[in-house]
Every structure is written in structure tokens, then in C-alpha cells.
Amino acid sequence: MTFNLCVLTPNRIVWDSEVKEIILSTNSGQIGVLQNHAPIATALDIGILRIRLKDRWLTMALMGGFARIGNNEITILVTDAESASDINPQEAQQTLQIAEANLNKAEGKRETIEANLSLRRAKTRVEAIVETIKRIS
């Protein structure tokens, strides 16, 4: 029993295929979605999207947006999305270190907010990689 998942960014279609289950991060916590889920529209936080296919799970880093669930279709519109398999681990770790350094030297409210968002995005990318490694081992 499957349903269609479509993940879209302003520039591309990241995913458009049948899945068995997903787990995504909303602004009020994580939710799991199976076939015949009740209709819902929700804001998405920066976080991990877990996608269950027949016999394996995939992980994707989402950079915030919205999800619409209904009629066995889920459409996710996000600022950006990356499959964990497409993320370079060394580059992600380096970006995390830079984001941490930028937060430490941020001055003023605006710089601090921007640095915090950059840090959350960097942590999410690293978390997607770690999640994938855990599932493989």
C-alpha cells in the first residue's frame, strides 16, 4: 500500500514517486504519514524527511516550507531539499564549522538570527548523512 510523494523546490522536482511511509518535521513536531492519512496542511520546519520505500528508508534534508496531505498524495514545497546521498560529508562538516564560527562572532539581533538559521541548516545536512549511515550499518 503506497501513496504519491512529491517534493518541490522553486528550482526543481526533488522527488516524485510512490512511497510506503514518510516522517517529516513540522513546526509543532514530527509526524508520520501512511496511506489514507487524514487531509492536512502544515508548515514544515528545517529538518529531516524520512522516506520508506518497500524495503529501505531514504533520508532528505528539508530547509523549511509547507506540506499538503490528502487523497493519498503528499506535496511538499520547500525552500531547498537535498537527498542525503547527494550531500558531501566533508563539505557538510566544514559548512557546520563555519556556521558555528559565524554564530560565535555574530553581532546584533539580525546577524544572530541569520547565523542561527545557517547553523540549523548545516546541522540538518549533517544529521541527514548520519541518519543514512545508521540505516546502512
From Swiss-Prot:
Location, primary (coarse class): plastid
Membrane topology: Peripheral membrane protein
This protein's GO CC annotations: chloroplast thylakoid membrane; proton-transporting ATP synthase complex
Keyword field: ATP synthesis, CF(1), Chloroplast, Hydrogen ion transport, Ion transport, Membrane, Plastid, Thylakoid, Transport
GO molecular function, one term: ATP binding
Subcellular location(s) per record: Plastid, Chloroplast thylakoid membrane
InterPro entries: ATP_synth_F1_dsu/esu (IPR001469), ATP_synth_F1_dsu/esu_N (IPR020546), ATP_synth_F1_esu_C (IPR020547), ATPsynth_dsu/esu_N (IPR036771)
The protein's name: ATP synthase epsilon chain, chloroplastic
Subunit record text: F-type ATPases have 2 components, CF(1) - the catalytic core - and CF(0) - the membrane proton channel. CF(1) has five subunits: alpha(3), beta(3), gamma(1), delta(1), epsilon(1). CF(0) has three main subunits: a, b and c.
Described function: Produces ATP from ADP in the presence of a proton gradient across the membrane.
PANTHER family the record matches: ATP SYNTHASE DELTA/EPSILON CHAIN, ATP SYNTHASE EPSILON CHAIN, CHLOROPLASTIC
Lineage of origin: Eukaryota, Viridiplantae, Streptophyta, Embryophyta, Tracheophyta
Organism: Pisum sativum
Family the entry assigns: Belongs to the ATPase epsilon chain family.
Record-linked Pfam families: ATP-synt_DE (PF00401), ATP-synt_DE_N (PF02823)
CDD domains named in the record: F1-ATPase_delta
